[in-house]
């Protein structure tokens, strides 16, 4: 690819330079040298005219008539001869030709190097030197141009800017092909990178075809994806294995606590042990949920309507809020908007952020839904302590806790929002945290609408 770019660049540059340098020389309206045949013809005419004048004695009263007779006699068919005296008088010219004749005489006045030049449909040739005793005349030939140069070509030569534009248009296909050959594999690489950024770790064999440099980059990209996929799989397996292994000692701990209560009765120590065991059990459950969600293949997707998916979650949250003495309002309920995904994962995502609001709010929780042509937006607001701007991106990390008002007594396992982010990203959506109009935290979920293709 590097060699191709280099070659195309220099080829284009060479073509442009060649056009700029050579085109003016191809203008038939420029002074050009005579062909050998034209040179011989001119010398022959010159000799015939000299001989004719030598055979025709001069007449002082009508000296020009003998000049007319000579040039009329020896003019080639369809052409005319002109004689220019040493005083600059032109013999044999028509009035409407005087301007071009004077222009040509001003440029071609050396009989040792006769030239030719086009003027529209006419062409002038000369000069050739004719001796008439002590007088010397310049002999010129005026004839029809063999092929008239088109007005468009004349316009090109007369307008350098237009010539530059035409040159650019001529070179444009080559440059467009070069740009396309570079942009196509680069676009494929970008699309593949976007898929990886969205969590879709799959191989892209099409990246390993094309120019050598992009082929190598595509192979490296696929190797990176393979390594990431292997690492993610190992991490998920480790997380799942640890969670399952913790189940056995946790079950034994809960069983031992129950036996100890039977023997010794209730105590603060036993109550604390049961509380921590229950929290550990919840944490293990959350770890297993997150591990399953991160394994994309485990998510069985289907088409579901938003109101059918989330109405039960909202009803349960309203009931729990009433029991807690808090206000729970749904300002704009969900409609029958189509979503495509795993119902359990999507239901769990909304449930987690609603429970988060119930846990940290003082008295108010508000939920609103909106839809546009692209997707569904869900806002969950509370009037709790909120989260500082520097912590808003971090709260979606597993086990991350803010310093203020987020201790273990009120903060759950620290995995709820991580589960939310994983589930939403699995469905090509996003979740973010912001300030709430109620004074606390606003959690926003966006999910794309399902569109049949």
UniProtKB/Swiss-Prot annotation:
Induction: Part of the putative cpxR-cpxA operon. GO terms for cellular component: plasma membrane. Keywords: ATP-binding, Cell adhesion, Cell inner membrane, Cell membrane, Kinase, Membrane, Nucleotide-binding, Phosphoprotein, Transferase, Transmembrane, Transmembrane helix, Two-component regulatory system. It holds the Pfam family HAMP. Residues 26-159 are periplasmic. The modification Phosphohistidine is found at residue 244. ATP binds at residues 244-247, 355-360, 382, 401-402, 412-417. Its EC number is 2.7.13.3. The active site is at residue 244. GO terms for biological process: cell adhesion. It is a multi-pass membrane protein. PROSITE patterns: HAMP, HIS_KIN. Residues 1-4, 181-453 are cytoplasmic. The chain crosses the membrane at residues 5-25, 160-180. It is found in: Cell inner membrane. Residues 241-451 form the Histidine kinase domain. The two-component system is activated by envelope stress such as overexpression of some (misfolded) periplasmic proteins. It catalyses: ATP + protein L-histidine = ADP + protein N-phospho-L-histidine. Its main location: membrane. GO terms for molecular function: ATP binding; phosphorelay sensor kinase activity. Disruption phenotype: Deletion in the CG43 strain significantly increases FimA production but slightly decreases MrkA production. A double cpxR-cpxA mutant in the CG43 strain activates expression of pecS and pecM. Increases production of the major pilin of type 3 fimbriae MrkA as well as that of type 1 fimbriae FimA. Increases mannose-sensitive yeast agglutination activity and reduces biofilm formation in the CG43 strain. Increases promoter activities of fimA, fimB and mrkA, decreases ryhB and cpxP, but has no effect on fur. Residues 180-233 form the HAMP domain. Interacts with cognate response regulator CpxR. Histidine kinase member of the two-component regulatory system CpxA/CpxR which responds to envelope stress response by activating or, in some cases, repressing expression of downstream genes. Activates CpxR by phosphorylation. This is Sensor histidine kinase CpxA. It comes from Klebsiella pneumoniae subsp. pneumoniae (strain HS11286). The lineage of its organism: Bacteria, Pseudomonadati, Pseudomonadota, Gammaproteobacteria, Enterobacterales. The gene is cpxA.
């Amino acid at each position: 690819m590097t060699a191709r770019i280099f070659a195309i660049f220099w080829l284009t540059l060479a073509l442009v330079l060649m056009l700029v340098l050579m085109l003016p020389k191809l203008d038939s309206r420029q002074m050009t040298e005579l062909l050998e045949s034209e040179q011989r013809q001119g010398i022959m005419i010159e000799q015939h005219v000299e001989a004719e004048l030598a055979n025709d004695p001069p007449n002082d009263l009508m000296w020009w008539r003998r000049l007319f007779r000579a040039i009329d006699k020896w003019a080639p068919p369809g052409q005319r001869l002109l004689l220019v005296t040493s005083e600059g008088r032109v013999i044999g010219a028509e009035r409407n030709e005087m301007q071009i004749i004077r222009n040509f005489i001003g440029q071609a006045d050396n009989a040792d190097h006769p030239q030719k030049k086009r003027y529209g449909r006419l062409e002038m040739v000369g000069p050739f030197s004719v001796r008439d005793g002590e007088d010397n005349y310049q002999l010129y030939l005026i004839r029809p141009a063999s092929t008239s140069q088109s007005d468009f070509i004349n316009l090109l030569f007369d307008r350098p800017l237009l010539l530059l534009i035409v040159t650019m248009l001529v070179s444009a296909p080559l440059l467009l092909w070069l740009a396309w050959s570079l942009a196509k594999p680069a676009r494929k690489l970008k699309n593949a990178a976007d898929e990886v950024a969205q969590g879709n770790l799959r191989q892209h064999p099409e990246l390993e075809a094309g120019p050598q440099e992009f082929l190598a980059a595509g192979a490296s990209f696929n190797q990176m994806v393979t390594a990431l996929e292997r690492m993610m799989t190992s991490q998920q397996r480790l997380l799942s294995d640890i969670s399952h292994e913790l189940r056995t000692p946790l079950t034994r701990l809960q069983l031992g606590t129950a036996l100890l209560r039977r023997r010794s009765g209730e105590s603060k120590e036993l109550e604390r042990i049961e509380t921590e065991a229950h929290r550990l059990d919840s944490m293990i459950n959350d770890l297993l949920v997150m591990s399953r969600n991160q394994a994309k293949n485990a998510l069985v997707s289907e088409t579901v309507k938003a109101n059918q998916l989330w109405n039960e979650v909202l009803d349960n949250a309203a009931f729990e809020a009433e029991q807690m003495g808090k206000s729970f309002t749904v300002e704009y309920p969900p409609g029958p908007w189509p979503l495509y995904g795993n119902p359990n994962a999507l239901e769990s995502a909304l449930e987690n952020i609603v429970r988060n609001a119930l846990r940290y709010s003082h008295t108010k929780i508000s939920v609103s839904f909106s839809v546009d042509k692209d997707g569904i937006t869900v806002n969950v607001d509370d009037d709790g302590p909120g989260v500082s701007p520097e912590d808003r991106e971090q709260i979606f990390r597993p086990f991350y806790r803010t310093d203020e008002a987020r201790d273990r007594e009120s903060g759950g396992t620290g995995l709820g929002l991580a589960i939310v982010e994983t589930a939403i990203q699995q469905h090509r959506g996003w979740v973010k945290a912001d300030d709430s109009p109620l004074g606390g935290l606003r959690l926003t979920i966006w999910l794309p609408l399902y569109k049949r293709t």
